[in-house]
């Protein structure tokens, strides 16, 4: 009887630790957003419109929308390995043109180095994981809206697509 009680008590004591390990393991085992974007851009040489981490089945993946010329590409990158899993091309029909304004498409093509420098800087900070990046027009300037998780919790920042300046998203 005491062995059963000891086993039960040990299980109850270790359960929270196991749960915590399960929650934090994906971050420790995944590549960074900037690495995922580089992987996608090695497949499709384009500027970033949007990028986010998602769960697809039982795997974490990055879905990255890139623009090149008159086409938008969705590239799926395995978050554990960095391998490109799939890609699809969408022509800029009137529907897609409505989703992505001409200024956004142009800015995505020219902001490539600025974005990567800023993301690398953010990811260099302790325990920082970028969850989503999205190009948008805010107050007549093109910015990347960034959602990240760090030691202080979840935050949203803006990266100026021209200068690379990082500011809080108020």
Language-model segments: residues:
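Long, terminal "pre-/pro-" and other extracytoplasmic accessory regions
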Residues: 2-12, 19-170
């Amino acid at each position: 009887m005491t062995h059963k009680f000891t086993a039960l008590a040990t299980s109850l004591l270790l359960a929270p630790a196991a749960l915590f390990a399960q929650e934090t393991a994906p971050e420790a085992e995944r590549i960074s957003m900037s690495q995922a974007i580089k992987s996608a851009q090695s497949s499709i040489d384009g500027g970033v419109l949007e990028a986010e981490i998602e769960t697809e089945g039982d795997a974490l993946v990055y879905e990255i929308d890139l623009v090149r010329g008159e086409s938008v590409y969705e590239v799926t990158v395995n978050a554990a390995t960095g391998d490109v899993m799939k890609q699809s091309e969408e022509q800029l029909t009137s529907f897609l043109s409505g989703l992505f304004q001409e200024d956004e498409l142009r800015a995505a093509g020219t902001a490539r180095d600025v974005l990567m420098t800023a993301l690398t800087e953010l990811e260099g900070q302790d325990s920082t994981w970028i969850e989503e990046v999205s190009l948008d027009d805010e107050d007549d300037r093109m910015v990347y809206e960034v959602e990240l998780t760090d030691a202080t919790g979840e935050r949203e920042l803006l990266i100026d697509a021209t200068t690379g300046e990082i500011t809080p998203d108020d």
